[in-house]
Amino acid sequence: MVFVKGQKKATKGSTQSGEEKTASTTPKVTKTPTEGGEKKRKKRKSDYTSFSTYIHKLLKQITPPTNAKSNEKGDRKFTISSKAMSVMNSFVHDIFDRIATEASGLAKKKKRQTLHSRDIQVAVRIILTGELAKHAILQGMTAVNKYNPTESKN
């Protein structure tokens, strides 16, 4: 759209010809008051996924065995600060994003629109190296086998 000197830009409230809108095309939804007279608001689900619960579960798993000599009070638990949790959360998001991007690139090279478990496995081998990749692939394969067990043939 080209504007000539002296011509006004179209705004949200007006049309291009300069006419004013009189009524909205969609009706407004009114909220019904609750018993206390307050309006009930819906909770919006956040778009951000947090892995903090899973990180806490991992911390419980790696707690060292209790030794009577070193620890007189009993169970010793690891804790994590909120900043460290934020770092771990962004780390997990970054790794998932890299794996998804690499796997989608592999599927596009094969001219497929569906991601297969093999694509994810190859992407993990590319992104993670060495022993970490071996453990990640092994854990992934056990999860896939647990989710989708092969049927016994009779």
From Swiss-Prot:
Gene3D superfamilies recorded: Histone, subunit A (1.10.20.10)
InterPro entries tied to this protein: Histone-fold (IPR009072), Histone_H2A/H2B/H3 (IPR007125), Histone_H2B (IPR000558)
Cellular compartments per GO CC: extracellular matrix; nucleosome; nucleus
Entry keyword set: Chromosome, DNA-binding, Nucleosome core, Nucleus
Compositionally skewed regions (Basic residues) per UniProt: 1-11
Molecular-function GO term, any one: structural constituent of chromatin
Stored SMART domains: H2B
Region annotation (Disordered) ranges: 1-48
Polar residues composition bias: residue spans: 12-27
Similarity remark: Belongs to the histone H2B family.
Role noted for this protein: Core component of nucleosome which plays a central role in DNA double strand break (DSB) repair. Nucleosomes wrap and compact DNA into chromatin, limiting DNA accessibility to the cellular machineries which require DNA as a template. Histones thereby play a central role in transcription regulation, DNA repair, DNA replication and chromosomal stability. DNA accessibility is regulated via a complex set of post-translational modifications of histones, also called histone code, and nucleosome remodeling.
PANTHER family in UniProt: HISTONE H2B
This protein's name: Histone H2B.v3
Classification of source organism: Eukaryota, Amoebozoa, Evosea, Eumycetozoa, Dictyostelia
Encoding gene, per UniProt annotation: H2Bv3
